[in-house]
């Protein structure tokens, strides 16, 4: 805990989110912008709010997020992971409910590397019989 802020780091794909929460009225600021301005897709907004809605803390915290790297989906997942960790830092009894929902576990799926002789990671060059 830093002052009256609770902190959590979240990661997803190549995105990293640093999340700070404190008691407030439910404002979420991502990289200096309101969340609805930063995330264009409704699904991204939904992903970010999931741990708050699960624990019934959607209107009780002001959240400040600094997120870098990745795309919109990766950043939304990283913010969700960071909010989950910050909530656990605030109240450890929330961990069981968040863990059961699958928000505590880091999603370890990463982009598979491109192989030599292939077009992409698994797409081979077209086979010619003759």
From Swiss-Prot:
GO cellular component: cytosolic small ribosomal subunit
GO BP term, example: translation
Any Pfam family hit: Ribosomal_S9
Gene Ontology terms for molecular function: RNA binding; structural constituent of ribosome
Gene3D superfamilies membership: 3.30.230.10
Domain of life, per lineage: Bacteria
Family that this chain belongs to: Belongs to the universal ribosomal protein uS9 family.
Protein name: Small ribosomal subunit protein uS9
Organism: Cupriavidus necator (strain ATCC 17699 / DSM 428 / KCTC 22496 / NCIMB 10442 / H16 / Stanier 337)
Gene giving rise to this polypeptide: rpsI
